[in-house]
C-alpha cells in the first residue's frame, strides 16, 4: 500500500519552535540520506496518526509531497509522547 503525506519545509529549527508546532497539532520531522542535504519538514498530526498504525508503514516507501514536489522516503525512527497518543518527531530516509 502506498501512503502520501503532504508536508511543508520548516524554517524555524529548535526546541521552542518544535514545541509551538506540536501545540498547533503539527509534527516536526527531518528527511536525510547519503549524499543529500537534510531537510526539516512539518506536517499535520492527523495526516500520520492513522496511517502509522499499519505495519507496512514502517517497511514501505512513502511519498511526501513537499511544497508541491514528491519525495520518496522510508520511516527511519519515530518518537512518541510518553502517555498521550501523539507523535513527537519522525525521521525519514530518502528511498
From Swiss-Prot:
Q: Name one GO cellular component term.
A: cytosolic large ribosomal subunit
Keyword Transmembrane attached: no
Q: Does the keyword 4Fe-4S apply?
A: no
Superkingdom assignment: Bacteria
Coiled-coil segments on the chain, per record: none
The alphabetical list of record keywords is: Ribonucleoprotein, Ribosomal protein, RNA-binding, rRNA-binding
Q: Which GO biological process annotations does it have?
A: translation
Q: Which Gene Ontology molecular-function terms are recorded?
A: 5S rRNA binding; structural constituent of ribosome
Its biological function?
A: This is one of the proteins that binds to the 5S RNA in the ribosome where it forms part of the central protuberance.
* Family assignment from sequence similarity: Belongs to the bacterial ribosomal protein bL25 family.
Q: List, alphabetically, the NCBIfam families matched.
A: bL25_bact_ctc, PRK05943.1
Listed under subunit, the entry gives: Part of the 50S ribosomal subunit; part of the 5S rRNA/L5/L18/L25 subcomplex. Contacts the 5S rRNA. Binds to the 5S rRNA independently of L5 and L18.
Q: What is this protein called?
A: Large ribosomal subunit protein bL25
Q: What is the lineage of its organism?
A: Bacteria, Pseudomonadati, Pseudomonadota, Gammaproteobacteria, Alteromonadales
Amino acid at each position: 500500500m502506498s501512503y502520501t503525506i503532504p508536508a511543508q519545509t520548516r524554517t524555524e529549527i529548535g526546541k521552542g519552535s518544535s514545541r509551538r508546532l506540536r501545540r498547533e497539532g503539527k509534527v516536526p520531522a527531518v528527511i536525510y540520506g547519503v549524499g543529500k542535504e537534510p531537510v526539516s519538514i512539518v506536517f499535520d498530526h492527523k495526516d500520520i496518526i492513522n496511517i502509522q498504525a499499519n505495519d507496512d508503514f514502517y517497511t514501505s516507501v512513502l511519498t511526501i509531497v513537499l511544497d508541491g514536489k514528491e519525495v520518496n522516503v522510508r520511516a527511519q525512527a519515530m518518537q512518541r509522547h510518553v502517555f498521550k497518543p501523539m507523535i513527537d518527531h519522525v525521521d525519514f530516509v530518502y528511498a
